[in-house]
Amino acid sequence: AVSVDCSEYPKPACTLEHRPLCGSDNKTYGNKCNFCNAVVESNGTLTLSHFGKC
């Protein structure tokens, strides 16, 4: 399984860096920061499906 380290999150602001990730909710996140913030908000229920757009 693929995973990302979200231990440094959440962060108050994310850059506009474009490196899409696909979440287990079938949503495409613009970059790791956006994805990790969502993971923290979901209390860990959101996971990484794969790198790239969904």
Curated annotation (Swiss-Prot):
Carbohydrate attachment residues: 43
UniProt xrefs under SUPFAM superfamilies: Kazal-type serine protease inhibitors
Pfam families in the record: Kazal_1
Keyword RNA-binding carried by entry: no
Disulfide bond entries: 6-36, 14-33, 22-54
GO cellular component: extracellular space
Claim: Repeat is one of the keywords in the record: yes
Domain notes from UniProt: Avian ovomucoid consists of three homologous, tandem Kazal family inhibitory domains.
Name of this protein: Ovomucoid
